[in-house]
Amino acid sequence: MNTVLVIGDDSDWESYKRFCEQLQKHHSKKLKWITATYDLIEKNELPIIDSDTIIIFLFFPFSYWDKHIEKEGYKGVYGNVEFYNKFRVFWSEIHRTLKKVYHGKKIHFINHPLKIAIDRDKELTKTILSENGINIPIPYYTRDYNDILKLIDRENKKLFLKVRYGSMGKGITYMEKGNWKTNFRFDDGKIVSSTSDYKWTFIDITDNVDFLKEILTKDIVIEEAIDAYKLDDIIFDLRLYVFYDKVLYIFPRTNKKDAITANISQGGHGRTTQFLKRFPKNVIDDATKIAIQTVDNMDINFAGVDVMIDKDLNVYVIELNAFPGFTKVSRFNISKRIIHEIEDMFTHKK
């Protein structure tokens, strides 16, 4: 019997804990399931596994992240390249340790540790997707504040300035003529990051050129806002949970029309799949195909792909998250579905 090793942190209540709770209800005759936490790797106490084949499912390492990357008292700007470099080193060490501990075993990673951090680099992700024919927002590469002012004041462009190596809707600045907003803070000429993962509230910084000059010196990506499909008095996006070549669930997310993002962690609201009936079936079919292609292009097997639909019903990929938060079980039991998918896929695999 093959073994599935699930590794995460107990502080990850949104994904890992929900997955473990589902496993407690699951009685498998197909695979042996074992859970472990990242601190066991640090202590050299990973479980002994007799199976010749091990399937490893990696969740987000919250404890490491909070201790070594976005740590308490950190004074730098959120989402900089230092975050990314440390994260990649962490995963290299995890890969090396797992290969050493389970030497001689055949290991299948759901998401390979050497590939799992790539979604943190928004620039690289969108370059890969664009080269593979997937629609992404129009990028801009200037770091001259005069160019930005020209784009928004003379050409009436609407722009997003996002930290290059961030997630969860943190570190976003939106700019259009007469309306600049950011969920950073700007104090005494310095950009200040929130100390929380949630509720990075937006403030008005319209025409604050000093802020603009400063943010342009940071690790950011600049992209044109999607001219989104108009729907009532709300903004929306869709998160598609992709597992290998299947979309397990489509999660519509909405926010009030003057909001900057529909991200749940920053004030957005989840909708049921009934929401999808507002769109022609071919649009949802396109989103499904594009999400599957996106995950394949990024060489991972499980991710949340965030898409937007423009006024002409074209689908654009906005973000990719290799560690997507799981929806509440009452909405859709993602853990249960993944468990069944893994069992179907790996029961007889050698």
Which residues make up each language-model segment?
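Conserved N-proximal alpha/beta basic substrate-recognition cap immediately N-terminal to
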Residues: D12-E14, I34-K150
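Short catalytic/ligand-binding loop motif for oxyanion handling, primarily in non-cytosolic enzymes
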Residues: E14-S15, W65, I118, M168-G171, ...
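A short, Lys/Arg-enriched amphipathic alpha-helix followed by its capping loop at the start of a domain
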Residues: S15-L31
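A generic structural motif
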Residues: S28-E42, F186, K190-I191
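Phosphate-binding site of ATP-dependent enzymes
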Residues: E155-N263
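Short, surface-exposed charged micro-motifs
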Residues: R239, D306-M308
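C-terminal active-site "lid" helix and adjoining low-complexity regulatory extension at the edge
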Residues: A262-F302, I309-K350
